[in-house]
Amino acid sequence: MQDNEYINPVGYSEMYEWAEIPAESPYGLFVTFSSENPDKIEPVKSSSDEQILGVTTIQTAHTSDDPNNWKYAYMCNEVGDKFLKNDKIAIGVKEYDQIEEFSYIHTRPYNHYVQIPSQYYDPNQEYVKRSNRKEWIRVNLIGKVIVRDNGKCKPGEYCEPNSTGKSKKQRGYAVPADMNVHGWKFYVTQRITENTIEIVMSPTMNKLKN
């Protein structure tokens, strides 16, 4: 495959925030949750990590958790159920007078429920979507996805996240899987470039045992 060839987006992704933005390209890396910041992500250190969330990617067929507006713009409870208030407005109703043979409009009160703006919401402040902020990134959770590798992974075989110890070099990259070691393994479908492969993020292919 040529470097300038277009790749159709596939898979399902959600937006996650980096604990620390990688110095090199942040795309095509296996990621897990950060031990110091549990709600944020970091490149996987080895295939034995308890939780491999997915692979960072530029685009997928469907992206979740990337709202167009600030999600707390309106008051809500702890699980996100928005509070409503009864708002009375006047609406115009068109009627026809059969005796006088003409139409006229009169107003009557109308009750409806509206969301309650949050006291912390500033409508004058422009909201920037997560996908347009460098500290956030798409993570492919299921389906086919492209991941960086050391150039040695083969289609039809399995790969696993690189075990680099404390070194950050190539952390989150794929390497050929050691099938004699218990850990997360992922099926390689094809080689894309010299240092990228396509794999399948599928729960049915995780945690192969020796």
Where are the predicted features?
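Extracellular receptor-binding modules and their adjoining Ser/Thr/Gly/Asp/Asn-rich linkers
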Residues: 1-210
